[in-house]
């Protein structure tokens, strides 16, 4: 009789790990504290709830995360399967209806013959094979347990979610439908700003009241999900090179490029809700309302969910984990998700996929599974276990810079990325034969 594996946390990573194990005949206890105990950021009791954006980012193979998604798709990832089924229009990105996405994953796992769902808070790491995938909002008690077994102090930063608004309340005469550089379908509503409008908006952001942070917590942001008011503090031009970048978004009414653009992205399958792209924030709700109403087209907008901000937690992985996401000092324990230093929905799920496949192979006596570095999955696993500057280890998105250089140098960036993507998928196909 095979051993039962404990997977703690039913987020993206834990859900993927549990699924990979169960599909290989391994019995799994999937332990999730919600709804018994909620977090400051979650709104439901569903598995793999998306708490920041509803976008899983770029889908093209000229994009690092696009390659990662395709690798996972070929490895029967439950997260990518759900995303493909719950997809909503988003240009060249893969965005999903949050409810359909998490609902599909929840039902699939709850009905799997090899998975037992246990709703309770875990304060101590259980004996036996365990995958810890408790995510950025790990409870203080369990976080201390993790510190005790890793021997390292926690690292932490803040992650922020953007406001969501009702489409019906948008002044459609002031916005236009377009994707940047007309890539993919025209999927974004764009709110153009003149220089005067931008300056009024920018000044209001700087004066807006920020929600308080506990004095004992040092703020440490990851660039990929930084509050827009923090970006604004870096200088008047920072937003213009970030979420309000107008390049490739010429107004079809005038044929001219606006001074600044705020983009709205569809958030649900019905197309009734939109999120404000890149506007994750920690402003007080009243301040959010005042600032958002300065955006052309959103003067009378109805905000259905205000932006929120919450603490994230991750470990110094290069010192304590190997490429199989195993704890070097206690290989029966694995970590998965953002806690390992992978950053992003897809990256988190990919780490769960690696942990789950590896543990299944170990239990079934099939030997270890180390993905080739030429694959995006392998390069992420290599990064978290071999990062050179581990004294200042930082979370990392999937990107082509993590992959080994090509044997023949290609100057053109797009052609180089295409070559790296093709190589990654070739390596993956060969590697799959060993699984």
From Swiss-Prot:
Matching entries from InterPro entries are given as: FAD/NAD-bd_sf, MnmG-rel, MnmG-rel_CS, MnmG_N, TrmFO
- List positions binding FAD: 9-14
Query: Which Gene Ontology cellular component terms are annotated?
Result: cytosol
Q: Which PROSITE patterns match?
A: GIDA_2
Report the EC code(s) recorded for this entry: 2.1.1.74
Cofactor(s) this protein cannot do without: FAD
Any GO molecular function: flavin adenine dinucleotide binding
UniProt keyword terms in alphabetical order:
Cytoplasm, FAD, Flavoprotein, Methyltransferase, NAD, NADP, Transferase, tRNA processing
Q: Which GO terms describe its biological process?
A: tRNA methylation; tRNA wobble uridine modification
Compartments reported by the entry: Cytoplasm
Q: What does the UniProt function comment say about this protein? A: Catalyzes the folate-dependent formation of 5-methyl-uridine at position 54 (M-5-U54) in all tRNAs.
The record's similarity note reads:
Belongs to the MnmG family. TrmFO subfamily.
Record's PANTHER family? GLUCOSE INHIBITED DIVISION PROTEIN A, METHYLENETETRAHYDROFOLATE--TRNA-(URACIL-5-)-METHYLTRANSFERASE TRMFO
**Name of this chain's protein:** Methylenetetrahydrofolate--tRNA-(uracil-5-)-methyltransferase TrmFO
Q: Which gene encodes it?
A: trmFO
